[in-house]
């Protein structure tokens, strides 16, 4: 059995690999792995905002340190928050400032972090003061319009510093107007492009003195990441109620918490589980349990439908892949779409077609992920068809090719798994994984060496 940790310093990749490309090493036998993964990005960035809105000092443990979370941390520091960082201990202490910001002007850079972009824009849009929000070229292309429309309806003003309805912007918050409201704030919100828009307003709800009601105008009204947001809000002392159409947060005393433990990243764990499923091997990721709040736990159940067996042990869930190969299936992945790439990457090894539906929104993420799936599979000689929100992948043997990652961490990590089962797969720009899992390839190489 091979075991490794996600911690430690960044290292060079072994073999003929560099930061420009990574040549995946085909495994010659079913994998038998145990490993750790870093903390959850989604939980880390929600916890950072919740801690900043507390009225006390909050110690966060199990923090993910990656490109996304570092941009979130540096943005909080740019806004005047006192933050102590201990990367070796995966810990951060945030001195909360309650219902107000430490400063009334400033500039932040959110990089490519969608959570930082949506959450912090919402917070600044209901604060008092004027702020500039900068972003990476990738983030400048991602959807923001429903968030800006909601902020404008609340009384914020926005100056576009680039394309309209996109970052970068100069925003003057609606704090004075919101403070003078005589009753509950009400807004309409379309979350069809991203549930982060709703999570953003739920997280900042305690900044509204008489509470807030959010009416969802899109067909999609809920999702796994919204449920993470609501659960974490409750753990920090504030309840968000959903009646099927509207989300309501009553006026409350604000968030309260002195410490918080962040779960391991299930999204990152899924790549190791997928490798075991594909090769008919075994994988256990430490501290991943069925009690996790993360929606990507559904991917493990999906692998079970494809023929894998799952066992919860004291220190994590173990997956054993089928000795006779994976079964094909048709699955709606709308609620755990980050793993659509992972399923697509192992789909050629299934015994029958794999069809993934209701994932049209992934076209507007770090890249057009549906396009990335189809283009890379076809480059590998795999037959597939796509529609606006679905893809069907036929069984086949992947041929040597270079995987275009489009600077998208999930494209890189998912198609690396495909390369474990065949020769000649080269991942371009593997450094894009720094967004959420800095040493993914270091961990993988350590597992492959044994």
Model feature map: region roles:
Residues 1-9:
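Ser/Thr/Pro/Gly-rich low-complexity, intrinsically disordered segments
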Residues 12-450:
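Structural preference for solvent-exposed beta-strand-turn elements
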């Amino acid at each position: 059995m091979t075991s490794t940790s996600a911690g430690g310093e960044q290292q060079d990749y072994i073999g003929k690999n560099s930061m420009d490309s990574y040549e995946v090493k085909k495994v010659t036998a079913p994998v038998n792995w145990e490993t750790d993964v870093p903390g959850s990005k989604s939980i880390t960035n929600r916890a950072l905002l919740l801690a900043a809105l507390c009225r006390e000092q909050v110690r966060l443990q199990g923090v993910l340190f990656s490109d996304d979370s570092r941009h979130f941390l540096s943005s909080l520091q740019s806004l005047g928050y006192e933050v102590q960082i201990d990367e070796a201990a995966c810990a951060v202490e945030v001195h909360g400032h309650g219902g107000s910001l430490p400063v009334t002007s400033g500039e932040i850079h959110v990089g490519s972090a969608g959570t930082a972009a949506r959450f912090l824009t919402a917070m600044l849009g209901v604060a008092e003061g004027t702020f500039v929000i900068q972003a990476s070229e990738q983030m400048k292309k991602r959807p923001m319009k429903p968030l800006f429309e909601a902020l404008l309806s609340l009384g914020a003003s926005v100056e576009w510093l680039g394309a309209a309805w996109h970052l970068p912007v100069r925003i003057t918050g609606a704090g004075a107007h919101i403070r003078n409201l005589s009753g509950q704030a009400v807004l309409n919100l379309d979350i069809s492009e991203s549930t982060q828009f709703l999570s953003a307003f739920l997280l900042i709800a305690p900044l509204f003195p008489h509470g807030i009601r959010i009416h969802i105008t899109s067909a999609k009204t809920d999702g796994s990441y919204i449920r993470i947001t609501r659960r974490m809000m409750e753990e920090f002392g504030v309840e968000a109620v959903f009646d099927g159409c509207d989300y309501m947060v009553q006026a409350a005393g604000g968030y309260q918490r002195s410490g918080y433990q962040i779960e391991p990243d299930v999204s990152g764990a899924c790549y190791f589980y997928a490798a075991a499923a594909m090769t008919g091997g075994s994988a256990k990721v430490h501290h991943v349990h069925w009690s996790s709040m993360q929606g990507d736990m559904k991917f493990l159940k999906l692998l079970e439908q494809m023929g894998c067996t799952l066992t919860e042990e004291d220190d994590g869930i173990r997956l054993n892949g089928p000795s006779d190969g994976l079964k094909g299936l048709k699955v709606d992945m709308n609620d755990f779409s980050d793993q659509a790439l992972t399923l697509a990457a192992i789909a050629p090894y299934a015994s029958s077609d794999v069809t993934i539906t209701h994932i049209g929104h992934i076209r507007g993420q770090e890249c057009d992920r549906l396009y990335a799936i189809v283009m890379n599979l076809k480059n590998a000689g795999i037959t597939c068809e796509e529609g606006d929100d679905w893809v069907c992948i036929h069984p086949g043997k992947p041929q040597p090719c270079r995987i275009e990652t489009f600077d998208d961490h999930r494209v890189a990590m998912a198609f690396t798994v495909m390369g474990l089962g065949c020769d000649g797969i080269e991942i371009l720009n593997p450094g894009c994984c720094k967004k959420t899992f800095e040493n993914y390839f270091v961990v993988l190489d350590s597992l492959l060496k044994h």
